[in-house]
Amino acid sequence: MEFSFWLQAIRLPRIVTAMVFVELTPFITFRAEYWSDEDLRRLQNYLLVAPDAGDVIPGGSGLRKLRWAAQGRGKRGGARVIYYRHVSAERIYLIYAYVKSAKADLTREQIKALAQLMKDDKDG
């Protein structure tokens, strides 16, 4: 066999840089009620590998919404996690989470307020 065949067969692991997770109070409150430490670690590990996995929230200046399984439910009926990835600071802010059946989507005013909070942190 040719050497090039062996090179194609080798799969290198993806290198993940260090990332700091910052949990805001609304997220902490949700997590304490609905998730174990293992659930949080699963979310963090997922975001380390796929930090841009959630849908961008229109008008949210980079805020993202991720569907995530909660309390034995699948993603569709589970939780929504609102987060922000601050690329240059290598941080992911876990801002807010809610169970889909208990709350509707965020209002425009809430989105604007959260976007401003993240902008202030970036600028300050």
Per-range role (PLM):
Residues 26, 35-55:
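Compact soluble domain cores
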Residues 7-8, 85-124:
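Enriched for short, Lys/Arg-rich terminal
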Residues 30-34, 50, 98-102:
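Alpha-helix C-capping/helix-to-loop hinge sites
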Residues 23, 43, 60-64:
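A generic structural signal for short beta-strands and their flanking turns/coil linkers
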Residues 22, 38, 77, 90, ...:
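Charged, alpha-helix-enriched surfaces in structured cytosolic catalytic cores
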Residues 54-97, 102:
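Basic/aromatic recognition patch in beta-strand/loop cores that engages polyanionic ligands
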Residues 30, 46, 114-117:
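Residues that form generic nucleotide/phosphate-binding pockets
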Residues 1-38:
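Arg/Lys-rich, positively charged N-terminal/basic patches that mediate binding to nucleic acids
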